[in-house]
């Protein structure tokens, strides 16, 4: 019996999915397998393994929102966090445009050497892609991490704020304008005083009203009776805004008991790039190896017989002063049928109009009429009657 030949399958599979590599663990969100692969040691080839779309395991995890996988990959050696797929997307771009705020924060704080200004094939950065998709929280995180708000794309020449306005991302545009008014998180510095600036003025105003109470007028009473209270957004610099600022400051018990800052003298500021946690602690994993230039495979040139290499190019690519021999062109046309032939009579001198053509049947009929006797025509006509 003959053995059946194996035919290639049309299904696209992940690289070495049967060996459970680093990429396999990231795609299947298998935290235990990923930890086992990291404990066993990861080679540079395994860390940079990609699929048919050019995406690494980190990119796939950022795209699907696998937070535990991304957090564990921060300790992976030889991992290039700025690696791009076939469309030019990085892991930060995929997480930002998908709206995974926690993954964007992980990438910004725990991955050393993260490039915020890397562009895709269309010239868009992670900040622009997040602004187009109206991911306001991701936009705020990128701006406070040092993303450049003034950078423009090479096609339309628009910034992230202009892209947000153009794509009707009103929430993102509002958050960007608020950051421009307050570009620094003052509550994350040691010099912050948890006092409400407007408190002294409001207390003095209340005391003045208590000392000299004035009876409300009829109009004020009418307005107080007929006015309706609706839910409003918290005002900037108001009570609720101050409450959030105090509870998120370094002096707040909510933060002091849970975490501590590594650089209290340098709070986050708009447009200022800070160092990641591994860079501050000196525990950054080994950087990825430098990419080697792709090897150019020589392509054999096959020419048609009895033709020069120059004849393989199009006619408009060849030089006009070429002295090579031109191949004659032969055009074949079908001869007209005999019944369609006609002759043109020469135009008499002195006439400017064209003479109509004389057909052969008209010429024969005219000759027959000339050969017949002039009087015989009437006799024949009478005899026939």
Swiss-Prot record:
The record's InterPro entries line, in alphabetical order, gives: Ankyrin_rpt (IPR002110), Ankyrin_rpt-contain_sf (IPR036770)
- Annotated ANK repeat ranges: 17-46, 53-83, 87-116, 122-151, 156-190
Q: Which domain of life is it from?
A: Eukaryota
| Amino acid composition bias (Pro residues), ranges on this chain | 284-297
Q: Which Gene3D superfamilies match?
A: Ankyrin repeat-containing domain (1.25.40.20)
Q: Quick check: keyword Ligase in the entry? A: no
- Tissue expression profile of the protein: Isoform 1: Expressed predominantly in the retina. Isoform 2: Expressed in the pineal gland.
| Biased amino acid composition, Polar residues | 304-326
- Pfam families membership: Ank_2
Q: Where is the composition biased (Basic and acidic residues)?
A: 361-373
**Protein name (record):** Photoreceptor ankyrin repeat protein
Q: Which organism's genome codes for this protein?
A: Mus musculus
